[in-house]
């Protein structure tokens, strides 16, 4: 049942800016917040704006009043294509008026509500524009937004993103940390919630961006629960799922996983995010690899990212044991569970697959080896068995560990898909082919030694990819 909104001013009311002798007629209500209402306003020439109206009698505390003045001071100085423009502010004895750029398509939360979830190519475009706006805010004017969410990302008539609502924003001086806990529950970074002693900075916006990406692709926020305390608990544990039915690309999973890191210093920079494959890809990565193989656009060389060094089916464990070049040992079980011992040998990452409401979802957990939960103790014993049996003194590299997204059984071995879109053909006859950079770089091995990527091996890889892609 809808609740009728009490309007601060009747539709049709004319607001006069006495200093500039400009009259604004209120045409309709666009939205409302805790202390403000936003109207479509039109001047005599026919130009339209969004007018944010704050009723002063509703502001009871000095702190809220100070935030209002701070919002106006910060927002009025901002000038960027991906930030909502504030043209003017003025006030009467009862109200404060902010004349803002009109975003005809509304906010991203409304778009998501209409569509359920968005396609990756559309999300990539929205995210790229948001990142460009954040680069301006963080690097050019030292402003941290602190309430980045779908409802504060607005769309103009051409569906370009504009960051708006700077009510919780702050200017960050060199090395400064803020300690005020603020934001919207689903989007708040863990250091804002739990790190008051150490404070927070620009990285809090990057965390919120990760939540936004996930929400646009999946349809619901990653830490969604019925009550706020449970949401905060999920954020603290960094406990979220990747629903299998959403069919997320490895690039999307990789970017989200990088951003949703509880350590703010380990999150990617905005510049790194802007160059990530998720924002630049134009076609399915397997199709691009296939095309590069078909047109001989692969260059042989050493792959400098993580990949599968060794794998073997372990019937006793009902899974595939594997070793990565980074030093990760893991088992990918037949029921889609994935248990990995990190290179430091101090902790494991556990991806658990289960069926909920007829759909398969994945849960990510991390545990110290001396505190393995009872429910995965047997799986961990299996991993220890695999390590004891097949640890043959492999040579590792100091590369960033990258987890396996998918394993596909092929006629002559396994096809591994890594989170960064590197793929590995591990053939039972001892040949292994590692394709990175969407097939532009290839390393071929026979046993553990480098080998030439000859036409026969190339042909085998092409045939397998043709089958995966359904090419004729």
UniProtKB/Swiss-Prot annotation:
**Catalytic activities:** L-seryl-[protein] + ATP = O-phospho-L-seryl-[protein] + ADP + H(+); L-threonyl-[protein] + ATP = O-phospho-L-threonyl-[protein] + ADP + H(+)
Q: Does the keyword Nucleotide-binding apply?
A: yes
Listed InterPro entries: Kinase-like_dom_sf, POLO_box_dom, POLO_box_dom_sf, Prot_kinase_dom, Protein_kinase_ATP_BS, Ser/Thr_kinase_AS
Source species, domain of life: Eukaryota
Annotated compartments: Cytoplasm, Cytoskeleton, Microtubule organizing center, Spindle pole body
Q: Give the annotated active site.
A: 147 (proton acceptor)
Molecular function as annotated in GO:
ATP binding; protein serine kinase activity; protein serine/threonine kinase activity
Q: What protein name does the entry list?
A: Probable cell cycle serine/threonine-protein kinase CDC5 homolog
- The species is Encephalitozoon cuniculi (strain GB-M1)
